[in-house]
Amino acid sequence: DHRDLHTAYRRQRQMCIRDRYRASYAGVKIRLNVRGVCCLQPDLKKISKNIKVTSIVDRYLEHSRIFSFYNNGKPKVYISSADLMERSFDRRVELAIEVKDADSKNKIQEILKISLKDNIQSYILESDGTYIRSKPSKGSKKIRAQSYFHRSAVKNAGKIATISEDAFTPHKPKTKNFGTAV
């Protein structure tokens, strides 16, 4: 029954929010960069005072699905196909994988840090559900995450072009009948 699925999703969403509130209450600092709707209320005394939610609205419809946690002071980084939307819980098969390669982990953490430092195109979710546009504080560096990533991609494009062409050449099987109907 569709109503049962909707009820299950609502419970799942409430559990996700409740778990973040519990972590905040225990003193865990939580930073969320959410592209769309966010049902969580940040900055409520005793409940979510350690939670900050930002949203970047800019040129690209880009939204990395990065999850970064510190466990006993050690970072654990995951990338995922899922967001925390109804469709991901009810109608899709999604996955999250831990990034173990040190270089990849560092690059992904850099993406997350730059995104959370954006003070040009980011908006901060207030406890009443309104968003306030970020502004750089006087004398601080202006950071626009998508411009930073664009410049970085253009700069690195030249390096990528020098990779050997044969590194990406597909190999055909040595079978006579490959690709023909029998």
Task: Explain the meaning of each model-derived region.
Residues S55-S134:
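HKD (HxKxxxxD) catalytic microenvironment of the phospholipase D
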Residues D1-R13, I17:
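Single conserved hydrophobic/aromatic residue that forms the stacking wall/gate
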Residues I30:
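Hydrophobic anchor at the start of a short beta-strand
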Residues G27:
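Phosphate-centric recognition/catalysis
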Residues N33-Y70:
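HKD-type phospholipase D/PLD-like phosphodiesterase module
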Residues R18, Q41-P42, R87-F89:
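Short helix/loop capping segments that flank catalytic or ligand/cofactor-binding pockets
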Residues R11-Q14, Q41-P42, K49, D103-V182:
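Flexible, glycine-rich loop/tail regions that form catalytic "lids" or insertion modules at the edges
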